């Protein structure tokens, strides 16, 4: 994750701003600079290589002292920065909005995936600039539309029916901020269209998850798509979701946290997010993740969501 101010800076033209991508030499200069505390939140002028990000974001970049940041000296960083600027420059951002826009935290890996989709000649995003910009605006929180299959970050499609598409995420192969844990495996499920879904399509998806992915929990971060994650990573996802939800509320950005379809979501996660929306503390909410919950009734005849160890699938071993 990183703020948009880590990729570009605003330049006032008439009554709105144009956004310009940083070059990596300017960033490198900023990372070596000694800057007064009172200037940490200001864009840094490298003199030689142009404007650089505010020094307060130093930890967002990979250095000898910090291996958890972005590999900003890669070609991919430049591609992501340019893509962000193209999307922002399609909007009219005024002085009252610019600080809020640049402070928004976005998924670096999501944006790299959109670059990969854009460069794939077989992908619809290669052929449609309009759809590409729409996808980026959704990714950076500048659109109220949800991420559907056409505008999704992408990956390897492992399941699809009339209503849903399930993607295996390819973060292990990334250049900008790769996941280093070789055991990482995670999926995302997007809606093909943002419209009511038939019970038949839901049952098809639940059956696929029940028999092929029952080593995983189906959760949501509240943004209109599902995530399929290892049970061992659920607590970590809970911490992140809770922190994001509370920070958004604190900063005045009221978000409509979408609980999605209770028949698909792991019931403990549904209880966790429902409790979070009611205003309970993190400890109270997380206890619900580890409780043995009895399902009131089976959502579909012939399908159970209970995990039986003699029926566990091989996906995820």
UniProtKB/Swiss-Prot annotation:
Region (RNA-binding): 205-241
UniProt entry tagged with the keyword Metal-binding: yes
BP terms from Gene Ontology: viral genome replication
Enzyme Commission number, as recorded: 3.6.4.-
Compartments in which it is found: Host cytoplasm
Domain of life of the native organism: Viruses
Entry GO CC: host cell cytoplasm
Keywords: ATP-binding, Host cytoplasm, Hydrolase, Magnesium, Metal-binding, Nucleotide-binding, RNA-binding
Cofactor(s) needed: Mg(2+)
Binding locations of ATP: 107-109, 188, 221-223, 227
GO function terms (MF aspect): ATP binding; metal ion binding; nucleoside diphosphate kinase activity; ribonucleoside triphosphate phosphatase activity; RNA binding
Main location: host cell
Matches recorded under Gene3D superfamilies: Rotavirus NSP2 fragment, C-terminal domain (3.30.428.20), Rotavirus NSP2 fragment, N-terminal domain (3.90.1400.10)
Active site: 225
Summary of the function given for this chain in its UniProt record: Participates in replication and packaging of the viral genome. Plays a crucial role, together with NSP5, in the formation of virus factories (viroplasms), which are large inclusions in the host cytoplasm where replication intermediates are assembled and viral RNA replication takes place. Displays ssRNA binding, NTPase, RNA triphosphatase (RTPase) and ATP-independent helix-unwinding activities. The unwinding activity may prepare and organize plus-strand RNAs for packaging and replication by removing interfering secondary structures.
Family under the similarity heading: Belongs to the rotavirus NSP2 family.
Assembly notes: Homooctamer. Interacts with VP1; this interaction is weak. Interacts with NSP5; this interaction leads to up-regulation of NSP5 phosphorylation and formation of viral factories. Interacts with host DCP1A, DCP1B, DDX6, EDC4 and EIF2S1/eIF2-alpha; these interactions are probably part of the sequestration of some host SGs and PBs proteins in viral factories.
Family matches, as HAMAP family: ROTA_NSP2
Protein name: Non-structural protein 2
């Amino acid at each position: 994750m990183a703020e948009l101010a880590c990729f570009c800076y605003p330049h006032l033209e008439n009554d709105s701003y144009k956004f310009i991508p940083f070059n990596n030499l300017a960033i490198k200069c900023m990372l070596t600079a000694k800057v007064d505390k009172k200037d940490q939140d200001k864009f840094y002028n490298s003199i030689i290589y142009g404007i650089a990000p505010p020094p307060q974001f130093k930890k967002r970049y990979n250095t000898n002292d910090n291996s958890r940041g972005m590999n900003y000296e890669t070609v991919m960083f430049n591609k992501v920065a340019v893509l962000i600027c193209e999307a922002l420059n399609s909007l009219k951002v005024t002085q009252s909005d610019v600080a809020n826009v640049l402070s928004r935290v976005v998924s670096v890996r999501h944006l790299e995936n959109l670059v990969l989709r854009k460069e794939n000649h077989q992908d619809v995003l290669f052929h449609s600039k309009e759809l590409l910009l729409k996808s980026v605006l959704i990714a950076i929180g500048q659109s109220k539309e949800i991420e559907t299959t056409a505008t999704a970050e992408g990956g390897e499609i492992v399941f699809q029916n009339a209503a849903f598409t399930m993607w295996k995420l390819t973060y292990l192969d990334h250049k900008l901020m790769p996941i280093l844990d070789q055991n990482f495996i995670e999926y995302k499920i997007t809606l093909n269209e943002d419209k009511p879904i038939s019970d038949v399509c839901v049952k098809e998806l639940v059956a696929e998850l029940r028999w092929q992915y029952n080593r995983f929990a189906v959760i949501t971060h509240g943004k209109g798509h599902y995530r399929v994650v290892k049970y061992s990573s659920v607590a970590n996802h809970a911490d992140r979701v809770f922190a994001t939800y509370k920070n958004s509320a604190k900063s005045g950005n009221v978000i409509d946290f979408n609980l999605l379809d209770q028949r698909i979501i792991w019931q403990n996660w549904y209880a966790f997010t429902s409790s979070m929306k009611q205003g309970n503390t993190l400890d109270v909410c997380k206890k619900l993740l580890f409780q043995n919950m009895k399902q009131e009734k089976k959502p579909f005849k012939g399908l159970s969501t209970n995990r039986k160890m003699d029926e566990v699938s091989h996906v995820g071993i």
